[in-house]
From Swiss-Prot:
The lineage of its organism: Eukaryota, Fungi, Dikarya, Ascomycota, Taphrinomycotina. Sodium export from cell, takes up external protons in exchange for internal sodium ions. Involved in regulation of pH. This is Na(+)/H(+) antiporter. It comes from Schizosaccharomyces pombe (strain 972 / ATCC 24843). The modification Phosphoserine is found at residues 449, 451. GO terms for cellular component: nuclear outer membrane-endoplasmic reticulum membrane network; perinuclear endoplasmic reticulum membrane; plasma membrane; plasma membrane of cell tip; prospore membrane. GO terms for biological process: intracellular pH reduction; intracellular potassium ion homeostasis; intracellular sodium ion homeostasis; proton export across plasma membrane; proton transmembrane transport; regulation of membrane potential; sodium ion export across plasma membrane; sodium ion transmembrane transport. One of its GO terms (molecular function) is sodium:proton antiporter activity. The gene is nhe1. Glycans are attached at residues 287, 319. InterPro entries: Cation/H_exchanger_TM (IPR006153), Na+/H+_antiporter_fungi (IPR004712). The chain crosses the membrane at residues 12-32, 36-56, 81-96, 103-123, 133-153, 169-189, 204-224, 258-278, 293-313, 320-340, 362-382, 408-428.
Amino acid sequence: MGWRQLDIDKVHLALIVAGGFITFFCYFSEVFRKKLLVGEAVLGSITGLIFGPHAAKLVDPFSWGDHGDYLTVEICRIVLDVRVFASAIELPGAYFQHNFRSIIVMLLPVMAYGWLVTAGFAYALFPQINFLGSLLIAGCITSTDPVLSALIVGEGPLAKKTPERIRSLLIAESGCNDGMAVPFFYFAIKLLTVKPSRNAGRDWVLLVVLYECAFGIFFGCVIGYLLSFILKHAQKYRLIDAISYYSLPLAIPLLCSGIGTIIGVDDLLMSFFAGILFNWNDLFSKNISACSVPAFIDQTFSLLFFTYYGTIIPWNNFNWSVEGLPVWRLIVFSILTLVCRRLPVVFSVKPLVPDIKTWKEALFVGHFGPIGVCAVYMAFLAKLLLSPDEIEKSIYESTTVFSTLNEIIWPIISFVILSSIIVHGFSIHVLVIWGKLKSLYLNRKVTKSDSDLELQVIGVDKSQEDYV
């Protein structure tokens, strides 16, 4: 009988991989971020792929028990709540008051257009699902992810060249639309699982739009205002120390996540608007540096999550011809989604968005709408909500759409996320190369102009330049 302490445990292997990767990234973060221009999402996904069940086979989250889908949903929930709160407190004070029109246009028309267009692509390319199933798939990838555009809105070299109004617009949009994707997601869920359809429409308006979203926003604002009021007096009477002050960006979103889940409201919107009201007068952000504990928390969560994502990518299903998922359909769907989901509508609404001044900025904003954590969250939440345990037996057995969606929704969504990581993760390299080529061209043009001027000064005809 061997020494029990030396038995290898799967969870401990996962801790070694996660801890080792984060340590490695921290030691060489300057190289990765500012020289190689590679962010947490790309490196984390690669690490998860290497050590996951399809390569080294050291980490397989779905072998830890029978609740893999639920575990993934809760991991995503915590990461999203912390991230959207961090986005909210990063914005200038009273940002929504001064930029309300830009935010509303970027949330409602842009998200609605992307949802419907993506649903059309899914319906055309995946014949085994009906249009409601296509709307559900589109609802999962309606929101944008701030991590994949961290080099633009964070501390990357391109962030300094991005106008502050564009940077703030992207932060506000990516932080808010994670929660705003909930009505689009539940629209299909309600129509699929609630019969008759008029009851589904009633539940969607009353329970999802008004209670989950509207009341979630209101409750988040109340919590944010109260906590800001308490913080103000805690500082005034010196009741709070520095360590506790830096713990708030983690504690408050966890509080919102727990309360929101228990009372059944949209905890993502609740966390975001709690952050907005918490920092409405810059009370919090003016006393905390950009590269302090909140940034550290966000980085750690991002590294852990995308490493986890790399281990759950269903590579075996990316050429699943039996289920009508040949890889060419996934590639075409991903390309169409990334190209047409935002760019056309952002160009269309550009005159209505005061923060977007030029067509070049419209192209920039339209392109940087990456798909990430929220898509994983909603894909696995859809699997839970469409399981036999959550749907009336008569409704579940009346159609095969539930079992079909349960089988194909994650392969489709994960392939789109992977495509987004590749495209948006390396877009920065294209921009840098383009900038260098443009600079080289302009320098050569200036040099040639100076040379022509010198020839004119010494009286040499330009046609005789070769003989000088």
